[in-house]
Amino acid sequence: MPSGCRCLHLVCLLCILGAPGQPVRADDCSSHCDLAHGCCAPDGSCRCDPGWEGLHCERCVRMPGCQHGTCHQPWQCICHSGWAGKFCDKDEHICTTQSPCQNGGQCMYDGGGEYHCVCLPGFHGRDCERKAGPCEQAGSPCRNGGQCQDDQGFALNFTCRCLVGFVGARCEVNVDDCLMRPCANGATCLDGINRFSCLCPEGFAGRFCTINLDDCASRPCQRGARCRDRVHDFDCLCPSGYGGKTCELVLPVPDPPTTVDTPLGPTSAVVVPATGPAPHSAGAGLLRISVKEVVRRQEAGLGEPSLVALVVFGALTAALVLATVLLTLRAWRRGVCPPGPCCYPAPHYAPACQDQECQVSMLPAGLPLPRDLPPEPGKTTAL
């Protein structure tokens, strides 16, 4: 035992500490403090053990919640007369003093503070407080967990108090939570009970499918190409010389164009209109272009559409010129002048046409008609 400390009781864990050289004054509180349930503090007051209370630690602490009881040891609940139960809250004379049964029900005491009521016909409940009303008669008509209410059975009709997510007279209708179309980007809405879920298409995520997944997050583009995100897809902006979905292909370098004069065998002619003045002959107005020249023009940079257009235009022009020549020859053989300048028989009345201006003159009256000039049918010559 250290100097200046003296234990007052075997149960007490506290000591009275005195200053060195000063006597310990234990008689200040020991005369009135219940040392069996506490000890003296340095200031002379009683310090109670756990489970005891009071100025002198003379009273035990009852069980928490004990209403009509006492204790002999800490944490007890000893009921007073007329009370029962764990917390002494049950009235043993409840059937005689309180009459809890309603609507003419008879109270029967069961002991230990418990009772039950014998209800009259048409009533039920612990205290016969409920009447056999519409809810009782309908046999729990509310569905999906709804609560039937009929004002304790005294209402004419019942009503159903529905849980969240259901509506209807008997809570039979599940509210369509997809009615407002909460899912975006073409997602499928799945209705539940007071909830919904979105089945997102590929490329989208989130509760409402509003998050576009970054397809460039995995860095699919090669060769240092820049990735551009799309909906469930991506594009790679490849540098020069590379191609493919992810720029994985090395594009070949095209060879410089070369011109080779290859013999093509027999030369074919393409007829196109000439640009200069044409002489008056059957072959006038024609320009011959060989296939070799066309090939050289194509190698010089003339595209296939332009070449096709050139050939078609040349063929049409050749056909038109040929038709004109044939018609001219046919008319010349018949002695009929083609449409154009006014023509009359040339001197000596030869069957030829002249391209000069017409000069109309009257024949002398005594000059006979030439025999080799046949008269035209349907025309009359005035002399």
Curated annotation (Swiss-Prot):
Q: Which InterPro entries match?
A: EGF-like_Ca-bd_dom (IPR001881), EGF-like_dom (IPR000742), EGF-type_Asp/Asn_hydroxyl_site (IPR000152), EGF_Ca-bd_CS (IPR018097), Notch_Cell-Fate_Det (IPR051022)
Q: Where is the EGF-like domain?
A: 27-58, 62-89, 91-129, 131-172, 174-210, 212-248
| Keyword annotations of the record | Calcium, Disulfide bond, EGF-like domain, Glycoprotein, Membrane, Repeat, Signal, Transmembrane, Transmembrane helix
Q: Where are the transmembrane segments?
A: 307-327
Q: What is its main location?
A: membrane
Question: Residues of the signal sequence?
Answer: 1-26
Q: Which SUPFAM superfamilies match?
A: EGF/Laminin
Going by the entry's taxonomy, the superkingdom of the source organism is recorded as Eukaryota
GO BP annotations of the record are:
negative regulation of Notch signaling pathway; regulation of fat cell differentiation
* Membrane-topology annotation of the record: Single-pass type I membrane protein
* Any Gene Ontology CC annotation: membrane
Matches recorded under SMART domains: EGF, EGF_CA
Q: Where in the cell is it found?
A: Membrane
Instruction: Pull the Cytoplasmic topological domain ranges from the record.
Output: 328-383
Please provide, alphabetically and separated by semicolons, the GO molecular function terms listed in this UniProt record. calcium ion binding; identical protein binding; Notch binding
Q: Which cysteines are joined by disulfide bonds?
A: 29-40, 33-46, 48-57, 66-71, 79-88, 95-107, 101-117, 119-128, 135-148, 142-160, 162-171, 178-189, 183-198, 200-209, 216-227, 221-236, 238-247
Identify the residue ranges that face the Extracellular compartment according to the record.
27-306
Q: Which residues are glycosylated?
A: 157
Q: Cite the PANTHER family for this sequence.
A: CRUMBS FAMILY MEMBER, DELTA-LIKE PROTEIN
Query: What does this chain do?
Result: Regulates adipogenesis.
Name assigned to this protein: Protein delta homolog 2
Organism of provenance: Homo sapiens (Human)
